[in-house]
């Protein structure tokens, strides 16, 4: 079952169908427009989401990069933000190739299993619970080594995100009160990785 057994985690490239209750439909190419000899799989669940990318996708990329020779690129989904691309380049030094609607054939795809990263749910068994402190600490160390913090910014910040889920019903009132106390509002997803580090360096 590709929905649960795919080695990279939850398989995102599937479509629901009214006549299929326990299966998935996968678009299979009839021909390849481009071929790459080797590449690291740098995609997973909700990669365009800043939270999911940092605790799930990036640790798996770092894991695979650790035992793969220099020069092998990282494949990512085309919709990930520039800050995510910056993070991959800064921590691995590898070329990042965005996968668009064209089909790409990879002769050898290097996949780091989902259990090598922290998941945001208990979909996979985790010895230390939902969050693995060692995994998060490793990602933090890699990022700060590649991009050391600069000058500290405002001590009072509110991290905002664009999205239609898990919204605060009275967000306008909340922001109004926070503004009175001198908080700065930051859409973290719109910043580059360098800007993200500087914003929270306080």
Q: How would you name each of these model-derived features?
A:
Residues 1-202:
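The feature primarily captures lumenal catalytic ectodomains
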């Amino acid at each position: 079952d590709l929905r649960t057994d795919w080695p990279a985690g939850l398989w995102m490239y599937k479509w629901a169908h009214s006549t299929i209750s326990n299966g998935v439909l996968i678009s299979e190419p009839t021909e390849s427009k481009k071929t790459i000899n080797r590449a690291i799989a740098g995609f997973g669940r909700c990669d365009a989401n800043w939270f999911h990318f940092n605790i799930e996708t990036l640790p798996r990329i770092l894991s695979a990069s650790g035992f793969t020779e220099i020069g092998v690129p990282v494949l990512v989904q085309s919709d990930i933000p520039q800050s995510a691309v910056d993070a991959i380049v800064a921590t691995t030094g590898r070329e990042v190739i965005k996968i668009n609607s064209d089909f790409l054939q990879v002769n050898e795809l290097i996949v780091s299993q989902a259990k090598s990263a922290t998941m945001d749910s208990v979909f996979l068994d985790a010895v230390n619970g939902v969050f693995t402190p060692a995994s998060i600490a490793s990602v933090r160390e890699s990022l700060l080594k590649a991009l050391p913090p600069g000058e500290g910014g405002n001590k009072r910040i509110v991290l905002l995100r664009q999205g239609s889920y898990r919204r605060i019903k009275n967000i306008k009132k909340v922001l109004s009160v926070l503004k009175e106390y001198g908080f700065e509002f930051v859409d973290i997803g719109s910043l580059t990785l360098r800007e993200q580090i500087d914003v929270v360096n306080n």
